[in-house]
């Protein structure tokens, strides 16, 4: 039980840190700001993560693990509608559960900056879940997948900020899936 609580605490710390890194950048985010955001003293936070760099590394590691997990979960599915739907479902659940990480991945686009090179492999994992390699993908497919991911990210952040995560999940998935260009299923079937 203690291990699970510790893991939940670490996940909360990492997600809040990611949100602050997204908003202020690594250099402008202080350990004290993260501690305040998670309700710990600075010393308490440093007990979990001995430095700001260790916290940053934990954010990157957690994001990488989530992306790899999503890729692994769809790897055996053939490219196409079923894989795309499963990838959207998995990534929607990740985005709704980890809004700070989503904000961090969106930060370069929202702040008009170049992407942090350390975030590139994490962003690429989302594309790989759809079987897309940006260097070789057909332009329409790449644009549709990027559009689906953009819709998913923005809607997940809005849902999280408004406390609508569970209520919006199905709509978030349907909207993101629609961007991929697959024919809508019959109205009597769930997406």
Show the residue positions of the predicted features:
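Short, basic, alpha-helical segments at the C-terminal edge of helix-turn-helix-like DNA-binding modules
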Residues: 61-67
